[in-house]
Amino acid sequence: MKSLVLGWALGFALVASPAAAQTFPKLAGSPVVDQADIIPAAEEAALNTQLLELQQKTGHQLVVATVSDLEGNDIADYGYRLGREWQIGDKEKDDGVVFLIAPNERRMNISVGYGLEPVLTDALSGRIIRDVVTPKFKAGDMPGGIQDGVNAIAEQIQLTPEEAATRAAAAPR
């Protein structure tokens, strides 16, 4: 009887967890998904073009997603699962990047596939958010902050492996 009750309680906990009820915006053929509607149309079109050209040039896929609600989830976990759901990056190389912004919750994250982690480390991603994106957001320029963040990420993933490793190692922790 105890095992039946324990099994039922565990099953209920799994069903009731935020991950089980997770809904993601749809990736509809362009690398920018602005569900939170914070990027003006002209800037969104320019970002889409830039990100498609970056993918063509490097083979690495970078997407920008804005969401109005994380549904109670941690942003890093949400970004990771969003990348898996959308199948960002090459399946074999695991080299995708998700730049996720949840403006209503004042959260940002850069989720990096394992294949790009030596190039775009957690420390460097944190520096990009802290030193490049956040100042623009605080000044009320969210589209500018997103653009500058994309530029910093794109610059890093276009470096040679040696240059990228040197820059990543120099990022303050």
Task: Go through each PLM region and give its residues.
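Folded, non-transmembrane soluble domains that reside on the lumenal/extracytoplasmic side of membranes
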Residues: 21-173
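Bacterial N-terminal signal peptides
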Residues: 7-17
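Positively charged n-region of N-terminal signal peptides that target proteins for export
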Residues: 1-7
